[in-house]
Amino acid sequence: LLSLQEEKQYFMNDNSKYGVFIIEFLRADDCADGEILSQILELSNIDVIYKWANNKIHLAELLQEFKKSKFRYLHISCHANETSLEINGDEITNSEFESISKDVLKNRRIFLSACKAANRDLAARLVSKNNAYSLLGVPINLRFDKSALFWPCFYHLINEIDASKMRREDIVETVKKCVNLFNIPVNYYAKSNYPNKLRRFKIRVG
């Protein structure tokens, strides 16, 4: 893992700004937890942009909008499994998502409100290959009610800690609090010192 000094230098060379860019693509009859999250973040005076993606091409366009926004955090709300994300009855394989986000994720953090998407394969593609700073999400099928509560709590606590830079230690400690509160397992993948390597934190109750 990067040392604290290396992590500080890493961010000093970055021109991103504090904010959460939410991209959601769920089924028509699903509760839009990403939209609900955006409304709560607005109430908390946290900079947020919310977008709904209709298909693969639209998703690729929205990822470019995220890049232009310079927001540091990308939050994705969708259905998923270990090998792909679901969008409007179609699927985006982990490999396809790696391809359309290739020039987008450098020095950014990714948060996935997507069942089983926080796995080593997708993390390796987005963190190790596409240079995202980290990826965080749940490794299980998560009920909507828990998702709708977990993410606002997480972002609220992070915002209380530091709105300028979010360190690895801040994430781990904050996630531990949320995991214990909601009884939800979380996988957190972070950039490593070693080329094409990443570190996984399995954060569980207790």
Predicted ranges, named:
Residues 4-71, 113:
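A domain-level signal for caspase-like cysteine endopeptidase catalytic cores
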Residues 14, 101-106, 127-130:
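Short, conserved loop/helix-junction motifs that constitute active-site signature segments
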Residues 21, 110-111, 134-136:
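Hydrophobic/aromatic beta-strand patches that form the interior of the parallel beta-sheet core
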Residues 38, 63-64, 94-102, 123-127, ...:
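Short amphipathic alpha-helical segments and helix-helix/interface helices
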Residues 41-50, 106, 129-138:
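Structural alpha-beta junctions
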Residues 52-119:
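Catalytic-core segments of thiol-dependent peptidases
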Residues 116-206:
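Active-site-proximal C-terminal subdomain of hydrolase catalytic domains
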